[in-house]
């Protein structure tokens, strides 16, 4: 069988073109590459509080924030911090669209490698026994759930059942990362809401942190000089309202325009062109 030909990237972001902007790689790709994770003051504060919750065996914590503020990056960062650390057993669940507590219990147990049991009580007993064994080994079990607003109110009962497993300390720590809709989920299950020890919120970045985030990404990609004039940055910040994800999306389009114009630093007109391209998606969905 003939060997398939390797595809060659021929778009604008070749290594040669990026070098014209003093970049070794693309700084604004929409990926979860941990090298580009910028921890602002608020991200650090939230992460520190979650670390305390885990190490103090406090049980249940929530990190809430609107779309695009970096919840998933912080969640993955949290998982990576414990993944290779002795004494911890973390699992990361990227989407938890659970409808029932049985469904939630089975999926979370499966993330730890436990078999599926037909009856919910059998599933809970098996999982409790597993957690007790971890505790005997002085291993702290951690569940990190992203997009937790997709859980039904009833499915939160699985978490309450897990938190009822105790042997002097909580056998499992649960951190939910969610959009603001999580308030409605908990409002329909106040018993589990009462178990939340820490509720943290991630908000849009202030201008100084936003500028530092964009510069940090450029620095990681090889460029020490600012990519934007002050006015150009303020236009990016304004249209994105301080939210990291749209700032990164607009900045990626700015990069494309700079290469087309053979320019080295983004001025306001470059950003305005990028904003025009960015806003087309909203017009298309209107």
Where do the model's predicted regions map?
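A short, basic N-terminal segment
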Residues: 1-58, 276, 280-286
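C-terminal alpha-helical "lid" subdomain
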Residues: 2-18, 80, 117, 171, ...
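Walker A/P-loop nucleotide-binding motif
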Residues: 56-77
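AAA+/P-loop NTPase substrate/partner-engagement loops
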Residues: 83-107
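Conserved AAA+ ATPase "SRH/arginine-finger" region at the nucleotide-binding site
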Residues: 95, 185-186, 197-210
